[in-house]
Amino acid sequence: MIESYTLNKPLNNKTNSDTILAQITASAKDEVLNFIYLGKQEYNKMWKIQKQIHELVKNDNMPSIVLFLEHDHVYTFGKNSNKDFLLDSYPDNTQIVESDRGGQITYHGPGQLIGYPIINLNHFTKSVSWFMRSLEQIIIMTLHEYNISADRKEGMTGVWVDNEKICAMGVRLSRWTSMHGFALNINPDMKYFDCMIPCGIFDYGVTSMYDVLSKEIEVKEII
């Protein structure tokens, strides 16, 4: 069973991590997969919250949950990322974070739907490939509802429209419990992708729902 909800009290970038964590844990329901929308949040604050929730879910002290949100402008490096994939021309208003997720460099910012599934796979299917393919399939099906022909690309992660990536993915699993997740480009400022080699891939580009449809879509509408 799936339960979707937003928090009773509005959140913003100034809401501290302890308050956000307390509201999430108080609202999550047992025996369902919980979905929650947190609005726009700073990356490091949410990384801290992710790690705290991950410990709870991993030890069966909290049900599995998917956090939906947007971030302020930030470039994040995966554990083994090549730092040369970020070009010197990146905007001054962009934060840089070295993360513990898998994958290479990626960008997060306004106009992207970020999804952090913190899921104990011991209660589902203990398979990394199953988990990644499931995330990809959910995004593909969502995009199909907007008449966007999206699919996987052989040998690559994420979701693609022809030769352009529309959704990047990078996760971390510990004791079969996931954290980090995906970034779906809805209507972000695409200039931020010009300052890096997205996911370390030279041969293909990046696109967004706005680029494909030529119309703006509210991020929260996708959830």
For each predicted feature, which ranges?
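Short, conserved beta-strand/beta-arch hydrophobic-aromatic motifs that form part
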Residues: 80-86, 95, 169-186, 190
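Short conserved catalytic/interaction loops centered on acidic-Pro-aromatic/His motifs
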Residues: 148-153, 179-180, 191-196
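C-terminal accessory segment of soluble enzyme catalytic cores
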Residues: 191-223
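N-terminal lobe of the biotin/lipoate ligase/transferase fold
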Residues: 1-160, 165-166
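Short, structured patches in soluble enzyme cores that scaffold and shape functional sites
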Residues: 117-119, 173, 184-188, 210-213
